[in-house]
Amino acid sequence: MVARRLVAAELEDDPERSYAQAHVARELAARVGVVREVTGLAAYRAGKWTEALSELRAARRLTGRESFLPVMADAERALGRLDRALDLVHSPEVGKLTRAAQIELLIVESGIRRDQGRSQAAVVVLQVPELTDGKVRPWSGALFYAYADALLAAGREDEARDWFERAAAADPEGETDAADRVHELGGMVLEDLADFGDDDAGE
């Protein structure tokens, strides 16, 4: 019964229905770490920030895993608790995360800096080696998109358009709306990152 609810929650496209399935599983097995994890992630996708934090804190205690940090930090940001979000972003446990999760945290931090009105800091925090090393990773599209968004918020529209183009090329499945953003800014969507030059990110 619990497993079926968890699978249903994972497969459900509608955030509210996913949350409802996960919540039933949580009522049946509240002391199981994976149940609290799935419930927390479902709550996050449904915009239930406080509950997401509560469930993911429990999952963290029960499993000993730190992989929830990016989602927890983003939930704190959504609640307007920027200092708490930054505490998570800079916690010692970040060193235990995969590089993909660390990049997720940097993307959250960039958003926090924008919320603080520090648009240039939002750009700088994303200037990591993976931004310009020419390699495409599963999370490159998200990184390029966040960088483009930060550039746009900083008033650097031409650079932002270039990076939205890169994001669209690195995101063939269309998981972001990078292609739409390119069109909004009057750019052209290219199909391959090889079509771009080797220019480094702006300072």
Question: Which residue stretches match the model-derived regions?
Answer:
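Alpha-helical segment of the N-proximal tetratricopeptide repeat
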Residues: 1-20, 24-27, 31-34, 38-44
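Structural register within alpha-helical repeat arrays
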Residues: 5-8, 39, 72, 109, ...
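Structural motif corresponding to the intra-repeat A-B loop/turn of tetratricopeptide repeats
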Residues: 12-13, 46, 79, 116, ...
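TPR alpha-solenoid repeat register
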Residues: 35, 68-69, 143, 177-178
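Extended, charged alpha-helical interaction scaffolds
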Residues: 83-155
